[in-house]
Amino acid sequence: MSDAPSGPPRLVVGVSGGSGIPYALDILRALRGLDVETHLVVSSGAKRVMSAEGGPQLADLTALASVVHDDRDLAAAVASGSYRTGGMLIVPCSAGTLAKVAHGFADNLISRAAHVTLKERRPLVLVVREDPMPRPMLQNMLAAHDAGATVMSASPGFYHAPESLGELLGFVTARVLDQFGLNAPGFRRWREDEA
């Protein structure tokens, strides 16, 4: 997170229209606990998913964010490369958002901020959740990777013997935060007790 300004680290958190909003909530909680300044952008598709799934709602996410931006605001601070951040994550990252990132199509703030993150060579993490993955989606993952993004699946491990949904979410959260050099407190790593 070397490109972040002095003071607390700063990350952009995009939430797009794939199922998996609880991952975004867990990551925002962890980032708040680590005193990371978060700039939240939630797509209209994500808002529809929240309504349909009945899990975490927009107010739950915005309560944990430092700053909330409208996805239609292409003049927001995070739309400019001169606004320094330590990177961006999109969780969940829908197939449509993945395609936009992979091909440089920036028609909303999430895709514009992702484009800026790539052009400034800052870490960009895309957490995809959709299954199965058709060939175009796999090609878009490769294109996003080749452009500089890290593509991760929202797939928890089980070697830490999770006993709750929170522990499953926490596994993915910890792996995402690893990409930014941040440690999720309480995360049990593979064979860590043997080191």
Curated annotation (Swiss-Prot):
Q: Which UniProt keywords apply?
A: Flavoprotein, FMN, Prenyltransferase, Transferase
Q: What class of enzyme is it?
A: transferase
Which Gene3D superfamilies does this UniProt record tie to the protein?
A: Flavin prenyltransferase-like
Q: Which Pfam families match?
A: Flavoprotein
Which Gene Ontology molecular function entries are recorded, alphabetically? Answer: carboxy-lyase activity; flavin prenyltransferase activity
Q: Which family does it belong to?
A: Belongs to the UbiX/PAD1 family.
Name of the protein: Flavin prenyltransferase UbiX
